[in-house]
Amino acid sequence: MGLGLLLPLLLLWTRGTQGSELDPKGQHVCVASSPSAELQCCAGWRQKDQECTIPICEGPDACQKDEVCVKPGLCRCKPGFFGAHCSSRCPGQYWGPDCRESCPCHPHGQCEPATGACQCQADRWGARCEFPCACGPHGRCDPATGVCHCEPGWWSSTCRRPCQCNTAAARCEQATGACVCKPGWWGRRCSFRCNCHGSPCEQDSGRCACRPGWWGPECQQQCECVRGRCSAASGECTCPPGFRGARCELPCPAGSHGVQCAHSCGRCKHNEPCSPDTGSCESCEPGWNGTQCQQPCLPGTFGESCEQQCPHCRHGEACEPDTGHCQRCDPGWLGPRCEDPCPTGTFGEDCGSTCPTCVQGSCDTVTGDCVCSAGYWGPSCNASCPAGFHGNNCSVPCECPEGLCHPVSGSCQPGSGSRDTALIAGSLVPLLLLFLGLACCACCCWAPRSDLKDRPARDGATVSRMKLQVWGTLTSLGSTLPCRSLSSHKLPWVTVSHHDPEVPFNHSFIEPPSAGWATDDSFSSDPESGEADEVPAYCVPPQEGMVPVAQAGSSEASLAAGAFPPPEDASTPFAIPRTSSLARAKRPSVSFAEGTKFAPQSRRSSGELSSPLRKPKRLSRGAQSGPEGREAEESTGPEEAEAPESFPAAASPGDSATGHRRPPLGGRTVAEHVEAIEGSVQESSGPVTTIYMLAGKPRGSEGPVRSVFRHFGSFQKGQAEAKVKRAIPKPPRQALNRKKGSPGLASGSVGQSPNSAPKAGLPGATGPMAVRPEEAVRGLGAGTESSRRAQEPVSGCGSPEQDPQKQAEEERQEEPEYENVVPISRPPEP
């Protein structure tokens, strides 16, 4: 029962093992048709290793005793046999199953039946037994190499020479034929026995070679050594290392080792004994190394087993190998091993120097420099870390996003960057606003003005537009620039023109020097001033807030305030060089002759005029042409004869001042003022001075704040639109040409209203000559004096005996033509 169950289990185990070991690519390996698709041997084959190479011949195809199965169901004879029953051996020339393979060894050998290898005869050698042997009858050759192996008693390469030795006690060498004696025999042919009591003897001499433990000539005495061996000749004991004595029975004493204990031990630790035979120590003393502790430590090391490094000795010198002490130390160190830093307050070699004062730190023991504590730096460690650094000597940069950290710990300080940003922004915003304000002011000051005075003149009047632009610059500088002398520069012509009838007077242009100006001409109109004063000068117009006439302390203060009245005050009298053609223009215009000075020269009264004896420079300008030249030409107008009245004596110099606005003159006309001034000039003993007052009413008064904003252009447009346009009354032509024989006004002209009486008296005058010239021109300051220094043209400054009719003709020839001036026809004089 048990056996029946065991066999199926064994078969299942065998199949599983075989199936798992088969190679899918092996010979005769097939896949089972079962659903498991396991590997198995094909039909008729049996598994061998991982393949199925054993054929199966079973049943009726089973092979007989001397047959083998070569394929499933096919049997053949064993190799080397043939026949019906496979009982006959193959002939010598065949081999293999059924003797079907031919043997190449025939006829000098036979083939092995299964493999076909040749087996040569005794006298043949080679792979196919093709070589004959040369060993003779007493030798046998090797079938593979052909070397002869001689029989005993024969030697030579062919085994053909007999040996000469005792064959019972020796053998001879096959190559040389020499006899090799067996133990106990000696001699050339080994014919003598040895007498050594069982010990061998030398073959040539027969001397005994005693065995260990025996000594003597014939090895008859036994040695007495406890350890070691005795001498074969004397019997003395040769002790091994670590022992001594006659019989080597004593070990070496402590501290010695070697043969006969002749060597001393090394530096073993605590003087422990070393090994008596080898001399090695279990451990060495400090400073020594090696198995026998006889090697000192290498330079730079010390201690047990030389495992420690020497300290910083002076200049890297080696320390003591056992203690590690240094002979000298580097600066900053003390102690036997130079491991102790200098005491506090000292540094340097042998700590002999005193440290400097370190407020927040310690002194470096080597260099003496201060090593600052965390958060401080500097030569004396008295300065806190700068922003962005922390640590000792402030050498560690902060790693905070905002760049600031605690100077000691390095921790980031939140908000520090924000505070700095706010501080920077608070500083930059006012600066930016100030910059923008300055830029706006510059744009407003330098931008073209939209006032009525900026209205362009007739087409092609480029010079007039340029004059208007220069007027803006002079107006802006008027409140800050005092009267200046232009040193070595000469201004031959200064023309102040206005081209708008609604604005009484404006300074607009300073013409450049003429190309025809003579370098030796003088700018001075006063012969008493001398050549030193002949320098051109100008004065800027006064602004609001100037000192009035009543508060002026002296003529210098009055003159320094300015020479021109402000352009908005047209009623203020001011001195103008004589240009009679201005009276004929549609718009009031003023032209200054060459060499006119605008700065005061001396403290003269308003009545003083330049000397008429000085030769005018207009004669050298005869070739001048153009609009500027025509404006500068001076002619004697007929209105010169319209001033027979004389004014009272001149006022004191302190009465004239600049920067003072006088109120309007009421119902008086400009012609009345001119006649009064001319009459006063004719009666005066000095040179003739012509003073003009332009027609028109002054602008409304304005405060200082409004005046500043008007200069910046804020109120100019609005103010121009709010005011009612008023025209300056144009003087009639007949009034200008009434009297031609009177002394002409060479530098200016006076416009009159058609309804004004030419000889009407001024208010407050006691007669036609009651008003003095100083009172008519009060408030002009330097402008009055500059008019006194203006050079008089020939027609106005010539000899008083000159023919008036001739002067009138010259005036008509030299009279310039002005734009928009239409001559008015008048009836002939009675």
Curated annotation (Swiss-Prot):
It is a single-pass type I membrane protein. Residues 516-539, 581-688, 715-830 are annotated as: Disordered. The modification Phosphoserine is found at S589, S606. The chain crosses the membrane at residues 422-442. GO terms for cellular component: endocytic vesicle membrane; membrane; plasma membrane. Residues 53-87, 95-130, 155-191, 215-249, 302-339, 351-382 form the EGF-like domain. One of its GO terms (molecular function) is transmembrane signaling receptor activity. Residues 644-653 have a biased composition (Low complexity). Residues 1-19 form the signal peptide. Residues 443-830 are cytoplasmic. Glycans are attached at N289, N382, N393. The keyword Repeat applies. Residues 634-643 have a biased composition (Acidic residues). Disulfide bonds join C57-C69, C63-C75, C77-C86, C99-C111, C105-C118, C120-C129, C159-C172, C165-C179, C181-C190, C219-C230, C225-C237, C239-C248, C306-C319, C313-C326, C329-C338, C355-C363, C358-C370, C372-C381. GO terms for biological process: cholesterol catabolic process; dendrite development; heterophilic cell-cell adhesion via plasma membrane cell adhesion molecules; neuron remodeling; positive regulation of axon regeneration; positive regulation of neuron projection development; receptor-mediated endocytosis. SUPFAM superfamilies: Growth factor receptor domain. Coiled coil: none annotated. Its main location: membrane. Endothelial cells. Keywords: Cell adhesion, Disulfide bond, EGF-like domain, Glycoprotein, Membrane, Phosphoprotein, Receptor, Repeat, Signal, Transmembrane, Transmembrane helix. Residues 20-421 are extracellular. It holds the Pfam family EGF_laminin. It is found in: Membrane. Heterophilic interaction with SREC2 via its extracellular domain. The heterophilic interaction is suppressed by the presence of ligand such as Ac-LDL. Interacts with AVIL. Mediates the binding and degradation of acetylated low density lipoprotein (Ac-LDL). Mediates heterophilic interactions, suggesting a function as adhesion protein. Plays a role in the regulation of neurite-like outgrowth. This is Scavenger receptor class F member 1.
